[in-house]
Structure formats: structure tokens, C-alpha cells
């Protein structure tokens, strides 16, 4: 019942609001009609002669004279005035009040009045000026088109005058008399809507109505932002001179040193660039003999990397190329016996792209670094295997040059020199494989170097440990690997499975094996079983994983052969270096008795390591004095032709047949 009573009260309240709204609207209409009639009556003070002429004209046309119309309007005005002066409550309001009290609405007694009004405006007077044909802003003295002489001018002024805002004023004032919309262009405020835009909208025109005439265009001052205001208010501060202690603190801060190192590298690269602006691409600047010599040069020296402090008297022990930045090569260096105060192990990163003579990064360790490699799946990490048996990790993003992580010296890890270090796997599953000279293979994760994930003892006949000196994985292989040892034998092994450990033993060299390289050309998987070994017995041997005997032995060297490496793009090309300072390039499709190209490094230093650039157009070698040489390989020798693979397959078959005949 309370709910029903509440609904009834709300309905009664809404009905009362509607009645009150109707009453106000009717009162406003009556008041407007009174004022309009009063103004029309007041405006009747026209010249009597004109009024008389007008009445005669209307009578001749059969229209009621103006005097009769004014008298009828005055009678209506008197009636409405009487009704308004009584100030008795409206019948609708009484009905609403009674409805709220008694619950019933009384019928309304309404009456209809027919009022006939006739208004004929006089002839309009048009006034033009010589300057403009638009209404002057803000005043009515210079109007181009004026209608103030009309009897309706007072009515229009009252129509557009400001009124007190109500919830229903928009509909009452602007929409209930659509017949008067044409008078908009004759109002005094037609230009005021464009005036004082900076102070808000002051136009009296209804919403949606556009003004007529040309607007007044003025210059607008540019906007002032808070920052400009703040700058104006700021007082110029005096520069305080730093003391020597404060300067030293800034210089020794980590951020300042990092900035100096990075900015110095950029400036050094810019200053080291030596571009020949007189290069003649037509070829008229060089003689024909010089061009012929350059085109026929199989090997030509490109760069020599050497640092007076860190490279001097240090033998290069290993090299590796970055997979993220192909122009970067890292080299590991042995200790310098003449400088006992310097770190024993040094690793330097060189840039082959820019003509700068200093390394990109220099890292050092307390023990001599015997092997190093880039982290394949992280461009900032560098790994190193030390003479003490530790695996160390450097990061070029940190300021310090010492390792950020290292493996422990314990029986669970390596305790002998680590000559073999390589990362295998994929982006989401990769491991670091290391082998020490005591025949222990360890698998590491970069996230945890505190202990190896897996270990394997490499033993021959379960009795004697194998001293491994070199290691290589065949193409697309992460489980099987081939190894060279100090006793001259070649071993194949597996990391996992039922046959984990040493699987096969191949015929031996007459001396320790110094280097091993597998055929990793990706275009022909038929050659994935091939690998090369070098030894101090002055020979290079070609092997197949399918046969325990060598396929061929290259015996052209007259000194220790220290390293060998297959070309990454050519199926039949490999490089080798020896202790006499000679670099040899062998193309098995051309000759197997003598090298295709050979060169002796200036000074004939003992060459220790050789490596190809990823493009196969350059070969990099390191010597015993700490110098790293980059040689350009002729394109006709480095780049294979279309039939190189088929030719190499044919020559390989011939080599196998000759090997079987010798047996």
C-alpha cells in the first residue's frame, strides 16, 4: 500500500508540474500580446494626414481601416489587463491542487477568443554608404539596411531582448513564432555574435542561426604556453665553479666513464675513416699492368689488428666471429711473460668494418684464455675457457672489464686447461660445450655457471683419459662431435644416448693434432661427413666419419701445421697456416698436390690460428706475436661457381677410389 501511495503522490506531483508549465506559458503569451498591442497603439502617433490617407486607401480596397483595428486591439488589451490584475489562481492550478488533495481532477472551463489583427508596414527606406555595405557593429546609426521605421520594430526589440532563463525558454521564445524568422537579418545584433569572441559568446541570436554579412577579422595574439611564462619568470642563475674534488667525483663516476667510452668509439670511427675522394671509377687513373696484378692477386693484405699494450708478446690462441654483427671478430690471447703485472688472459673484440686501430672492447682475466667464442643468441656476451679450467663470461654492457660470472674450480667442473669451447643448440634450447685436456666434457647453461648441467668422461677403453686439444661439431649436429688429441688420434663421441662417450677411433697422426674443422656448407648435406685435421707432423688429412682411415693426406708444408678451416661458402676450399708464417688456400677441385694460393706473412712469424669471415671473402689469421691479419680472397677463388658441388663430388669419388687402391 505504501508503494502504491508513493506512486500516486509522484503522479500527482508530475501533473501539477505540467499544469504550472502550461499556466506560465499562457501568461507569457498574454503578456507579450499586451506589450505588442501597446507598442502598436503607441506607434499610432503618425501624422494624421498619413493616417487618413492610409484609411482611405484601405477602405477603397475593402479592408478595415487602421483605427478600427487599433480599437479592437485596445479592447483585447483591457480584457487581458483585467484578468491579470485580479490575480486569482488559474483554474488549472486549482484543479491540480484539488486533484492532489482529493485524487480527482475537475473539468476546466475554457473559452476561445477570435482576434483579427491587420498590420501593414510602411514603405522601407534603404540607406547605403560609400564605404561598406554591412551593418556597423554595435550601433544602429550606420545600418545598411534599416527597418526601424516599421511599426514592428518595437515588437522585434522586445522579442530579442534578454529574458530570464527557464527550462522551457528555448521552445517558448524561438520556436513558437517561426513566422518571424525572416526578421533575423534586420536586427541590431546581427554582427555582435562575432564580436568579443575572447570574452565568451554574447550573441542574442538563437542557437543554430547564422549571422549575415562579412565578419570583422582581427589579428589573434599567439598562445603563451606555461613553459614560456616560466622562462620569463626565471631568474638567470649564476654558474657555480666546481671544486677539484667535485670534478674528480664526476670523472670517476660510472655514468661519465661509460659516456666517454661510447662517445670516444664514435669519434674514433669518424676520424679513422680514410675515403679516397679521387677514386676513378672509369679506370683511367691506374695503369693496365696495375689492374692486371690486382685482379690476379689471390690473397692481399687488408688489415692488421694490434694493440701495443694488450697484444704485445701475447700469442693468439683462438678466434670467433659474431653471428649478430658479422664485422666483429674476437680473439683470445695468452699471457705476456715480460709483463708480470698485467693480467694473464686478455680477450679483444676487433671491428673489420671501420678503419680504426684500437679494439672495440678489451676484457681480461686472471688466467690465460685458451679458447673464446661469442654467445650465438646474445650479442653482448662473450665466453672464454682459461688455462686454470674456469669458464668465464664477459658482458660488454657493464663498465668493468673483468668477468661477470665464472665457473668454480672444483672436481665437479674442469681443473685442467680448456682448449675447446663452443655453443650449440637453438634460440630456446642451447648449451655451452667445453672440453678440458684431462678428457672431461661439460655442458653448461648461461643462466647458471655454478655447476655443469651434464658431464662426460672421455676415456679410451675405460682406462685412460684422453687429452683433447681440438673439437668440432658436424653440420646441424648437437649430439655427435669429433675431437683431436695430444696422442695424434681422432675420436668421435656422442653426448647422449646409449652410446654416450667415445664411439670411434681413427688412425693417428704422427704428432699431436693442432686443429680440426668439419665441412659446414649448408647447400649440400652430402658433404657433412667430411672433416679436416692438422698436426705438427707437417700434414693435413681429409677424413670421413664413415671411414676410420684418412681419405687423403696433404703433405706440402715444411713446418708445423697449426690450424685448418673449411670455407663457409665454397665446398672444396679450405685454408691452413703453419709455423713458417705461410698461409695456404687449397681448392680440391683444381689441385690436391699443391695449394691454389699461398702467401708468407711479412716477417715470417709463426701463425697459430686461422678463421674465415661469414661471407667467405676474407680469411683471418693470428700469429705468435699478438697480431691479427685480415686477408682479402679473390672473388673468383672465394665464390663458387654453379658446378663446384658436382665437380667436388666427382673429385671426392676419385679420391676414395685411389684410397681403396692403395689399400
From Swiss-Prot:
MF GO annotations: dynactin binding; dynein heavy chain binding; dynein light chain binding; molecular adaptor activity
Intracellular or extracellular location(s): Cytoplasm, Cytoskeleton
Entries under SUPFAM superfamilies matching the protein: WD40 repeat-like
SMART domains: WD40
Positions with biased composition (Polar residues): 86-99
Extent of Basic and acidic residues compositional bias: 17-37
One GO cellular component, as annotated: protein-containing complex
Gene3D superfamilies attached to this UniProt entry: YVTN repeat-like/Quinoprotein amine dehydrogenase (2.130.10.10)
Subunit structure: Homodimer. The cytoplasmic dynein 1 complex consists of two catalytic heavy chains (HCs) and a number of non-catalytic subunits presented by intermediate chains (ICs), light intermediate chains (LICs) and light chains (LCs).
Protein name per Swiss-Prot or TrEMBL: Cytoplasmic dynein 1 intermediate chain
Species assigned in the record: Drosophila melanogaster (Fruit fly)
